[in-house]
């Protein structure tokens, strides 16, 4: 049986037996290991190295009505991404976001995965060849049309998209590359 549980509640649900396993972003896999109630069967990096991950999404109406705010939002994400991608800043970021008002997870659990230090909970420890990346000289946050088109093809493949669409046109309308370029240019972020 599949159930939907918010990521921060997954460890607690495992602990009380409401679920036997889960697929989730960090730090919740590491938290289950740290708490001694789970292990990591595989990481998403094992399945698809450097895969697209989270999305900052806004409606077209928001972008049209508040273009400066939308641009500033992108700039804030780019600045934060550049900061976090610097390994020397990751410990302070882990400390900041570990607080109960943010992620509410132990700082050490967050920090180790930030640094690419993995422990699967059943005896294997390693330094990940593809640790979390947030900026990588502007490549990570760029809204690649190829990613958008790939996701659309998968929606079609798995029956979530019922009719044929112009994948490129849809990806262009969603990805807002021009707005991204404006924001990136103001910060001297390279455009891939």
Describe each model-derived feature in a short phrase.
Residues 1-16, 27:
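Short helix-initiation/N-cap motifs at beta->coil->alpha
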Residues 19-38:
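A ligand-binding cleft/hinge motif common to bilobed small-molecule-binding domains
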Residues 33-66, 74:
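Periplasmic-binding protein-like
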Residues 65-179:
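Secondary-structure end/capping motifs
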Residues 177-192:
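C-terminal functional modules
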